[in-house]
Curated annotation (Swiss-Prot):
L-citrulline binds at Y88, S93, N124, R128, S180, S189, E265, Y277. It comes from Marinomonas sp. (strain MWYL1). It catalyses: L-citrulline + L-aspartate + ATP = 2-(N(omega)-L-arginino)succinate + AMP + diphosphate + H(+). Keywords: Amino-acid biosynthesis, Arginine biosynthesis, ATP-binding, Cytoplasm, Ligase, Nucleotide-binding. This is Argininosuccinate synthase. The gene is argG.
Length: 410
């Protein structure tokens, strides 16, 4: 283990990563650099500095990455209308590439020869962190303590703290929630405890960001989201930064009971796992983006995007953000967004997001052609006869050759 001289640790300041920091110092006899990212998780990150200093750490990075997170990771993903297995908006998955990127950048800045993370050996995050790290710095060494040590429970972690005099305050010792949680500006997730039984309904006090739809206001809330090149740029006519837009949508969505999902997903490592997620702002953005695309995207371009989306979602879920194929797909997706400009009006009511209006200077919707009234010759209905005959030709030939579908067909 002596080949490692300096390691950059993804550090939250909590129990697990505080133990990891000390463990790295003891087991690898190396210098530890800590990196703490503010991705909008709703907790103060600055206390991580004092905790790291108490462990004798001299190089401490604490960074506000909220704008970069939303601008360069969340928004590009939403341009593709990305959703995994029909329900998961990838709130955890999309945060890992940014953390991996900064770990490697800091390693380069500080001359570190390794990085470390606190992901367990059972989950997807270990894969996401490490695939990203190897893509960005092929020769980097990755230390994953949960795959090496024998500290397998909270009790053993606490015992390690006491043995090595690791300063962990009372609020860290006290387990505030029975669930394993992860949060950033896009979502908050819950796993473990009673959720490990997929038949058990979550207790209502588990949810943090949203009221239950039953307790949401009895009057709807209307909002308008402005789009430029596929990205939201304003709410109710007020221009906002990417992070502010998502923060605002989280608040208004949560107040209206929007964004709760309870799913069993297929993890990349092979197991099924249940997770509950609150993604109020993301749920609104997904609905709004599809609405503005519905009037600005050509039919075949829209259908091609829909065909690509599950593959794109799987790439992100499995940790391949920094892959050539994701970059290729992103280029195609971004090209499709050139004319995705305009405004969407939505009604938020008791857990539901309903599109009630959409408009764009780049709209392909032509009321003169689509009207059920007299179109003044804009659309010649007689043209449909030839169109139908040509599209039916292959099926007519098959039927004539005996490939019918009725019981009496031979």
């Amino acid at each position: 283990m002596s080949d490692v001289k300096k390691v950059v640790l993804a550090y939250s300041g909590g129990l697990d990563t505080s133990v990891i920091a000390k463990w790295l110092q003891e087991e690898y006899n190396c210098e530890v650099v800590t990196f703490t990212a503010d991705l909008g998780q709703g907790e103060e990150v600055e206390p991580a500095r004092a905790k790291a200093q108490a462990l004798g750490i001299k190089e401490i990075y604490i960074e506000d990455l909220r704008e970069e997170f939303v601008r360069d990771f969340v928004f590009p993903m939403f341009r593709a209308n990305t959703i995994y297995e029909g329900e998961y908006l990838l709130g955890t998955s999309i945060a890992r590439p940014l953390i991996a990127k900064r770990l490697i950048e800091i390693a380069n800045e500080t001359g570190a020869d390794a990085i470390s993370h606190g992901a367990t050996g059972k989950g997807n995050d270990q894969v996401r962190f490490e695939l990203g790290a190897y893509a960005l710095k092929p020769g980097v060494k990755v230390i994953a303590p949960w795959r090496e040590w024998d500290l397998t429970s909270r009790e053993t972690l606490m015992a390690y703290c006491e043995e090595h005099k690791i300063p962990v305050d009372f609020s860290t010792k006290k387990k505030k929630s029975p669930y394993s949680m992860d949060a950033n500006l896009l979502h908050i997730s819950f796993e473990g405890d009673q959720l490990e039984d997929p038949w058990t309904e979550p207790e209502d006090d588990m949810w943090r960001w949203s009221v239950s739809p039953e307790n949401a206001p009895n009057e709807p809330t209307y909002i308008e989201i402005g789009y430029e090149k596929g990205d939201p740029v304003s709410i109710n006519g007020e221009a906002m930064s990417p992070a502010t837009i998502l923060e605002t949508l989280n608040k208004v969505g949560g107040a209206n009971g929007i964004g709760r999902v309870d799913i069993v997903e297929n993890r990349f490592v092979g197991m099924k796992a249940r997770g509950c997620y609150e993604t109020p702002g993301g749920t609104i953005m997904m609905k709004a983006h599809r609405a503005i695309e519905s009037i600005t995207l050509d039919r075949e371009a829209a259908h091609l995007k829909d065909e690509m989306m599950p593959r794109y979602a799987k790439l992100i879920y499995n940790g391949f953000w920094w892959s050539e194929e994701r970059r290729m797909m992103q280029a195609l997706i971004d090209t499709s967004q050139k004319y995705v400009n305009g405004t969407v009006r939505l009604k938020l009511y008791k857990g539901n997001v309903t599109v009630v209006g959409r408009q764009s200077d780049n709209s392909l919707f032509d009321s003169k052609i689509a009207t059920f009234e007299d179109d003044a010759g804009a659309y010649d209905q007689k043209d449909a006869a030839g169109f139908i005959k040509l599209n039916a030709l292959r099926m007519r030939i098959a039927a004539q050759k005996g490939r019918g579908f009725l019981d009496n067909d031979k």
